[in-house]
């Protein structure tokens, strides 16, 4: 389902804190090689751009602090009704597709699960949508 959302989108927009966004680097490169436009968006108002309807936004936030500290962010992300995917402990966007990472695990395990999700999305897309 995630790959279908990505396939049917004009752009893939990755949003996460600076620490979490580093996990997107390999995914961004892999999808670029597959001919897809992948953009990392900022969580800061001065640099943020509003996703369009035909975009797919992937929001990575383990604890949800990115949303708690930036209450304007969700409204701006959802403004044009793009496809939305969240990755983290909470599915704080009820109308988004959520990939949940269990809370209370060791940080190493959390990172392994996150890496697994990103690899699965990338490899499944390469195998089934190219």
Where are these regions (language model features)?
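Glycine-rich phosphate-binding loops that contact phosphosugars or nucleotide phosphates
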Residues: 7-130
């Amino acid at each position: 389902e995630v790959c279908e959302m990505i396939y049917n989108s004009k752009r893939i927009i990755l949003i996460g804190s600076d620490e979490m966004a580093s996990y997107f680097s390999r995914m961004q490169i892999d999808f670029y090689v597959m001919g897809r436009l992948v953009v990392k968006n900022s969580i800061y108002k001065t640099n943020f751009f509003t996703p369009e309807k035909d975009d797919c936004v992937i929001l990575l936030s383990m604890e949800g602090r990115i949303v708690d500290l930036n209450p304007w962010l969700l409204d701006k992300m959802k403004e044009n009704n793009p496809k939305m995917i969240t990755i983290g402990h909470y599915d704080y966007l009820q109308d988004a597709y959520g990939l949940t990472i269990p809370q209370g695990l060791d940080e190493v395990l959390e990172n392994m699960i996150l890496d697994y999700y990103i690899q699965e999305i990338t490899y499944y897309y390469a195998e089934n949508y190219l």
